[in-house]
Amino acid sequence: MKLKTLPPTLRDKNRYIAFEIISDDEFTKDEVKSLIWEASLRVLGELGTALAKPWFIKYDPKTKTGIVRCDREYVEHLRFALMLATDFNGKRLIIRTLGVSGTIKRLKKKFLSQYGWK
């Protein structure tokens, strides 16, 4: 028996955030994933993180840019949490938000194309 899919009106509304890491140090994909999760937990707490549903999508170590997904209602909360992240494993950093979009395709075209994303 095949399960029915939810209609679009009942699905979670997501937004995608493009970010850039400004640092002299290099970061791996796993470090960035942990960084996003820990920054969210530190600022929003467990309940806020559960409601924001941050989800790491992609990271390019060459340009130090990436994409993270979150719930539409908590975009500003997650941006604030990322902004407050200043160090990770002894490495100093700044996370700059490049922009927010409803689709990954538009996010890449509008905010990440200048960094070589296609």
Swiss-Prot record:
GO molecular function, one term: ribonuclease P activity
Enzyme Commission number, as recorded: 3.1.26.5
Name of one Pfam family that matches: RNase_P_Rpp14
Keywords: Cytoplasm, Endonuclease, Hydrolase, Nuclease, tRNA processing
InterPro entries (alphabetical): Pop5/Rpp14/Rnp2-like, Rnp2-like_sf, Rnp2_archaea
Catalytic activity as recorded in UniProt: Endonucleolytic cleavage of RNA, removing 5'-extranucleotides from tRNA precursor
Keyword Isomerase on entry: no
GO terms for cellular component: cytoplasm; ribonuclease P complex
Compartment list: Cytoplasm
The organism's place on the tree of life at top rank: Archaea
One of the GO biological process terms: tRNA 5'-leader removal
Annotated family: Belongs to the eukaryotic/archaeal RNase P protein component 2 family.
Function (record text): Part of ribonuclease P, a protein complex that generates mature tRNA molecules by cleaving their 5'-ends.
NCBIfam families linked: PRK03717.1
Complexes and interactors: Consists of a catalytic RNA component and at least 4-5 protein subunits.
Stated name of the protein: Ribonuclease P protein component 2
